[in-house]
Amino acid sequence: MSEILNIAKAAKASCEQLLNLSAQAKSQILNAVADELVRQKEAIKAANLLDLKAGENAGLSAALLDRLELTDARIEAMANGVREVAKFDEVVGEVLGGWRHPNGMQITKIRVPLGVLGIIYESRPNVSIDAAALALKSGNAVILRGSAAAISSNKFLVNLFNETGAKFGLPKGAVALVESTDKEAVGEMIKMHEFIDVLIPRGGKNLKDFIIQNATIPVIETGAGVCHIFVDESADVREAVEIIKNAKTQRPSTCNSVECVLLHERVAVKVLTSLARELDGVQLRVHEDLWAKFGENLGEISGDLDANLSGLKAEVKIGESSNGAQLVKADESDFGTEFLSLVLAVKCVSGVAEAVSYINSHSTHHSDAILSRDYANIERFLNAVDSAVVYANASTRFSDGGEFGFGGEIGISTQKLHARGPMGVRELTTSKYVVRGDGQIR
């Protein structure tokens, strides 16, 4: 019998015990796990260092190494997220509605767990703790399958969760890690419809496409984040630059960082000039139309000449690094690309109508924003952009379960069925009807 089959059977068997686990016991487990994360911070970092060294030797990109790293701040954030989940009201058994049938039967709709969750994810070891905490709070068992790059970190974190949880009644098998790093293990796991109720992939496009195309289990797709920010002509330029800077540079390897900025044609050169000055270390890939417009206004641009931006303290260099950004002419393939690095595509549009149309056809329907002071344009954008999260005058970096008050997330769903956006405890439940009668027949 395979490792995964044993894990899946044990997870399914734990579901009934999880239903009987009290809200108090769940909170005790989660608070104890949070305390243990902080107490064992150095041991966690030591396990993580093994993964980081292996990743460096394997030539992982800076973006992937950033996702992989567990710093003091990230471990503290994990612990705080678990504590937040522990504070949530109990959702299992929540009454969602009810009515009396004409024949006297009482019909009640209640919230129940999904069952066994299968989480397949890449790089980020914090997902192990986030997923386990949210699964427990929502009454679900969870099978975790992380990447080979994070195997030491994931083993340590899942063992910590289980050893701590067992002291307070966590059922055996309720939180499990598939330790096999063979790709065949994923292929086996995604066909176990008898034991696993839903799959939630978190990773790159290739992983998600493989699971969607081959799974025999329902999948909640957590899509890539090709996030856009549209700067309207009425936007406060200084504020817009600060928001874009945050959305691109705070943590560029995340799915909620901005990948493309659309500039209203009437303010495009002004905003691009400010971005070029302020976004240190960022490569701005400028669409050819805006590239020409920029050159017409500020002097001829050449791949080996400096563009002296009059009235600015900084000098922006075309095609090479400077104290500000690096400007290069974009290829069409740059638009619609998730860079996950300090690269930003920039394009100008005629107004909000073109911005909406462009985003709906080029984004991954994750998180998109408008920066504007025009109420009508803001409302048009928020209503028409078909994404899981839409913003007015705020950074896309807030698309996060913790920031939304969920205490972490199982993923950010970009599909429309079962859940959409950051998925917290409630999104990991479904419903059932309880009908109480007194001998009624039809």
From Swiss-Prot:
UniProt xrefs under InterPro entries: Ald_DH/histidinol_DH (IPR016161), Ald_DH_C (IPR016163), Ald_DH_N (IPR016162), Aldehyde_DH_dom (IPR015590), G-glutamylP_reductase_CS (IPR020593), Glu-5-SA_DH (IPR012134), GPR_dom (IPR000965)
Intracellular or extracellular location(s): Cytoplasm
Pathway: Amino-acid biosynthesis; L-proline biosynthesis; L-glutamate 5-semialdehyde from L-glutamate: step 2/2
Domain of life: Bacteria
Keyword RNA-binding tagged: no
EC number(s) on file: 1.2.1.41
Keyword ATP-binding carried by entry: no
Gene Ontology CC annotation, any one: cytoplasm
Single Gene Ontology MF annotation: glutamate-5-semialdehyde dehydrogenase activity
GO biological process: L-proline biosynthetic process
The reaction(s) this protein catalyses: L-glutamate 5-semialdehyde + phosphate + NADP(+) = L-glutamyl 5-phosphate + NADPH + H(+)
Primary location recorded for the protein, binned into one broad class: cytoplasm
Annotated keywords: Amino-acid biosynthesis, Cytoplasm, NADP, Oxidoreductase, Proline biosynthesis
Gene3D superfamilies xrefs: Aldehyde Dehydrogenase, Chain A, domain 1, Aldehyde Dehydrogenase, Chain A, domain 2
Described purpose of this protein according to its UniProt entry: Catalyzes the NADPH-dependent reduction of L-glutamate 5-phosphate into L-glutamate 5-semialdehyde and phosphate. The product spontaneously undergoes cyclization to form 1-pyrroline-5-carboxylate.
NCBIfam families noted in UniProt: PRK00197.1, proA
Sequence similarity: Belongs to the gamma-glutamyl phosphate reductase family.
HAMAP family registered for this protein in UniProt: ProA (MF_00412)
Protein's name according to its UniProt entry: Gamma-glutamyl phosphate reductase
Species in which this protein is naturally found: Campylobacter curvus (strain 525.92)
